[in-house]
Amino acid sequence: MAKAKGNREKIKLVSSAKTGHFYTTEKNKRNMPEKMEIKKFDPVIRQHVIYKEAKIK
């Protein structure tokens, strides 16, 4: 029998500093329906900046 699809969705976290750097991660759509914003390190400018969620194409 086939396994049911999970609630987890792959997302891309894009730097708000417009450097083009991004992280990929997963999030649970049911527990967190809003867009994710998290502060992470951007190695291009060597600073902590806010990363915003974007869909993976």
Swiss-Prot record:
InterPro entries: Ribosomal_bL33, Ribosomal_bL33_CS, Ribosomal_bL33_sf, Ribosomal_zn-bd
Cited SUPFAM superfamilies: Zn-binding ribosomal proteins
Cellular-component GO terms for this entry: cytosolic large ribosomal subunit
Family matches, as PROSITE patterns: RIBOSOMAL_L33
GO molecular-function terms, A-Z: structural constituent of ribosome
GO BP term, example: translation
Keywords: Ribonucleoprotein, Ribosomal protein
Stored Pfam families: Ribosomal_L33 (PF00471)
Family under the similarity heading: Belongs to the bacterial ribosomal protein bL33 family.
Record's protein name: Large ribosomal subunit protein bL33
